[in-house]
Curated annotation (Swiss-Prot):
It catalyses: tRNA(Lys) + L-lysine + ATP = L-lysyl-tRNA(Lys) + AMP + diphosphate. The gene is lysS. The keyword Magnesium applies. One of its GO terms (cellular component) is cytosol. Mg(2+) 1 binds at residues 413, 420. This is Lysine--tRNA ligase. Its cofactor is Mg(2+).
Amino acid sequence: MSDHEQAQAQSQDENQIMAERRQKLQAIREKGIAYPNDFKRSHFAKPLQDDHAAKEAEALEAEKIEVAVAGRMMLKRVMGKASFATLQDVSGRIQAFISRDNVGEDVYADFKRWDLGDIVAVKGMLFKTKTGELTVQATEVRMLSKNIRPLPEKFHGIADQETKYRQRYADLIMSEESRETFIKRSKIVQKVRDVMVGEGYLEVETPMMHPIPGGASAKPFVTHHNALDMPLYLRIAPELYLKRLVVGGLERVFEINRNFRNEGMSTRHNPEFTMIEFYEAYSDYQRMMEMTETIIRECALVACGSTTVTYQGKEVDLGKPFDRFTIVQAIKHYNPQYTDAQLSDAAWVASEIKRLGGKLPPAPGLGSLQLALFEECAESLLWNPTFIIDYPVEVSPLARGSDTQPGLTERFELFIVGREHANGYSELNDPEDQAARFQAQVAQKDAGDDEAMHYDADYIRAMEYGLPPTGGCGIGIDRLVMLLTDAPSIRDVILFPHMRPE
């Protein structure tokens, strides 16, 4: 049987099962309320297991612990006048024992017709089976929601991997690993928030639709505001609005929210992604690197219980101080055959990028060429956490220039497992310098660089009130979760990743 024929047969089987279950649902409707909403749960599965699973049967029976649990029925064993069912809730699983003598003949007859996937409620007393499993001996059992579509079998293979992303609801039902990933994601985000609040930062919300896209070099999504008859752009970064708040006197601010970039999709990129950006007055990029280390270590502890984690079979040490290299130092560290003279020769660097199959930057000055070469020959080798520092000014239009190294900025990017995780810098707070850099970006855009920034006159106006010395940083939440949950693809850590239409 071909794959197409097999898929057709499976579809026919599923349609038949769904038709039968709709008939069951109709029978339930005829008896009364098909979707009751008056059940009150008293306990979750895992806390019950944690508190009582180790107890001896006699001791548990003596306590007479009454519970009301509910969840999706994942297993069912009918044995004449009694049956076992396993219910799954958000915390875990617990077994129920349903006997005709305890729940009544009519209810038991109904229960035997129920299907895997039904949402079931059970009231009763805890006891231990002969095999020692903690179980609820049901005195009452009810269906709360009828399953129509049969549960999928265990996901495996490429086709099913796509199904996991498209039907995350089914994936979460069937995969404990997926549920654990997204529970960890929530804990990671909460820990980031806790660290920021503990450091005296104020959480704020800034616009998601911008009249001028800014704060990063990227292609925006464009929409139209009908009432104002004007284009708007889904934000590519909140940076310029957050720095406006620092101008206004909110000296430590952060935002955890979505950014949108109308660019390619890959295992590392989703058009809609989550970041934290934070800004602190009277600080610099050194302080931002310290904050970044703290955030990542604290998140590792809450997600993994350790600062040493394993990613795709290889250890990552987040506990020791992160390494620091300039772009040229990193290139030479991993490519000792290159000489200082070669790396200072723009023409040679450009030819080496081409030889390696890389793409030349839109504005090929020496600094941007060195960065492009770094991306070709060193970036993927940065396994343990490494700050790459002192970026060239031509690729850092919002970063403060170095006082000691002309042409460079006080900027860093953090790389772990060969991919960027954070970007930060001492903020440029000279409005005249910022205006000139915006003009240079406009020139690049006019020359064909559609990722170059627009000129933001209102941001310049804000800076003219005086932006104090400020450090800022952005950390990609999705990539951090990938690292801490050992996920190979960004789609594994986004509940509903973007997909091509079916």
